[in-house]
């Protein structure tokens, strides 16, 4: 049973020879090649090499394009900071939507427009070429509250839930459209599964989660399923 067969069978509830092994690796994968993590985040060829080497060395059943949470925000125009040996970071005190009125004029970037999203899509195409017959290929997008926080600033967004609920709904609706466009191109490029990172959901209580976050996570997952993709939701 190949890794690909194992994961697909398990997802469909069929017997497998062992449970699939699909741990998230980012900086660990870069270490396997001796690459700077900055290069892992910005050069799809470095990411692909690190993922494949890690999967082969440790018996993983998949490869993954996750490197940091800033791909989509950077392409939207958000200021980000690059480091030699840690993930790309959003600069919260310069948040793109510090002025929330800018949301009305914010354009969704083209995932194939040569930016960081495009870099991730190129990684998927290379994964498909190199290991597509054997491994499951997982793309990555940000969830509604995670990307909303990347664009607005996490601390400001937490106050928006109380101070301006309609804005939060508008922001999350924008995020869902952005992420579904990105997911569509990732699936076309070769992704079998779309991972959704929505870590900021763990920072709110159940009332806020059910009113604001859950409905948009559901729309996002349903949208990816409608595109023919499988979904893995990651809330760390």
Locations of the language-model features?
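Active-site loop segments of alpha/beta catalytic cores
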Residues: 1-31, 35-40, 50, 54, ...
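Loop-to-helix transition at the N-terminal end of transmembrane alpha-helices
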Residues: 44-48
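Membrane helical hairpin/interfacial module
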Residues: 58-73, 77
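A contiguous, mid-domain pocket- or channel-lining segment that forms the substrate-recognition surface
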Residues: 80
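Acidic/polar active-site rim loop that often engages polyanionic ligands
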Residues: 98-108
């Amino acid at each position: 049973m190949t890794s690909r067969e194992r994961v697909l069978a398990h997802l469909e509830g069929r017997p497998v020879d062992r449970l699939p092994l699909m741990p998230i690796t980012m900086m660990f994968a870069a270490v396997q090649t001796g690459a700077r993590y900055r290069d892992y985040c910005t050069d799809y060829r470095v990411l692909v090499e690190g993922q494949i080497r890690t999967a082969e060395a440790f018996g993983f059943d998949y490869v993954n394009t996750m490197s940091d949470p800033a791909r989509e925000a950077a392409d939207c125009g958000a200021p980000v900071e690059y480091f030699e040996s840690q993930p790309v970071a959003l600069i919260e005190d310069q948040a793109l939507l510090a002025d929330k009125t800018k949301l009305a004029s914010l354009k969704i970037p083209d995932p194939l427009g040569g930016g960081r999203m495009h870099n991730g899509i190129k990684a998927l195409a290379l994964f498909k070429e190199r290991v597509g017959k054997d491994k499951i290929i997982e793309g990555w997008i940000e969830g509604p509250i995670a990307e909303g926080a990347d664009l607005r600033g996490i601390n400001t967004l937490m106050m928006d839930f109380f101070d301006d609920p309609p804005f939060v709904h508008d922001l999350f609706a924008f995020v869902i459209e952005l992420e579904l466009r990105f997911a569509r191109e990732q699936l076309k490029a070769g992704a079998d599964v779309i991972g959704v990172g929505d870590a900021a959901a763990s920072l709110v209580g159940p009332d806020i989660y059910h009113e604001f976050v859950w409905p948009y996570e559901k729309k996002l997952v349903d949208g990816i399923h409608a595109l023919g993709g499988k979904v893995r939701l990651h809330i760390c």
